[in-house]
Swiss-Prot record:
GO terms for molecular function: structural constituent of ribosome. One of its GO terms (cellular component) is mitochondrion. It is found in: Mitochondrion. This is Small ribosomal subunit protein uS14m. Keywords: Mitochondrion, Ribonucleoprotein, Ribosomal protein. PANTHER family: 30S RIBOSOMAL PROTEIN S14 (PTHR19836), SMALL RIBOSOMAL SUBUNIT PROTEIN US14M (PTHR19836:SF19).
Length: 128
């Protein structure tokens, strides 16, 4: 008896809740490029302090040239993805790398689509 009541409750719940709201439709990352960028962001954060200290030694002109060259070698020995220049801003919905509005983290195409349909709070079309 309890199993049938539970089953009927579960069926009514599934009908009441749309399928997109009940579970995740696809993976968290849109594609492999976004995952690669996330790995680069983590590595850049991990090595940020060390990279800052070594670069300050390398760019300090008061120190001897030998020490500056050693610091340059240490920077070269760090992982390539630890450099913050390799981080690319991407759209969180499409993973598009260009034309990304930094404040919303959306590409210009997705931004305009969502703004036109009133799905971005505080954003409205310019009318004059």
């Amino acid at each position: 008896m309890a199993a049938s009541v539970l089953g009927s409750l579960l069926r009514t719940f599934r009908q009441a809740v749309p399928p997109s709201a009940s579970g995740q439709v696809r993976g968290y990352y849109v594609d492999w490029r976004m995952l690669r960028d996330l790995k680069r962001r983590k590595m850049a954060y991990e090595y940020a302090d060390e990279r800052l200290r070594i670069n300050s030694l390398r760019k300090n002109t008061i120190l001897p040239k030998d020490l500056q060259e050693m610091a340059g070698d240490e920077i070269a020995a760090l992982p390539r993805d630890s450099c913050p220049v390799r981080i690319r801003n991407r759209c969180v919905m499409t993973s598009r790398p260009r034309g990304v509005k930094r404040r919303w983290r959306l590409s210009r195409i997705v931004f305009r689509h969502l703004a036109d349909h009133g799905l971005l709070s505080g954003v409205q079309r310019a009318i004059w």
